[in-house]
Amino acid sequence: MKIGEFAKKNDITIDTVRHYIDLGLILPIKKTGQYDFDLRCEKDIKDIQRFKEMKFSLNEIKEILTYKTLGNLNEGESKDFLKNIFEDHINRLEKEAFEISNALTLVKECEKDLLSTKLNQNINLGLSIS
């Protein structure tokens, strides 16, 4: 299928498809100057979308797809590889979630302090503009 149909079918823009091609995430066959997207491209784009939902970066996704494609892994090795990738990613996401939770708590405390300040009290938040 052609690039426009592929983009529409997968609910992405043509620019996104081209970006993924430039990064080597999808590898369509080029016939007479036009890209032709096959079932392998369909599978790859579904994998890309799924990994993006899991908050993997495009570079991480490329590493995963490249290793799966070129690594000549048997099923057990493939599972071990992905297990390690997922464990590392889980740890990073848990750390980010903890940091976001702490930041959210601090913002809520500041908001509460601000709201509890007397309304008619002037609060100096910066430089005087006069």
Residue ranges and their predicted role:
Residues 3, 39-130:
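Arg/Lys-rich, alpha-helical DNA-contact motif
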Residues 24:
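Glycine-centered, phosphate/nucleic-acid-interacting loop/turn motifs that mediate DNA/RNA or nucleotide
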Residues 30-35:
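Short, Lys/Arg-rich nucleic-acid/phosphate-binding segment
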Residues 1-14:
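Polyanion-binding surface elements
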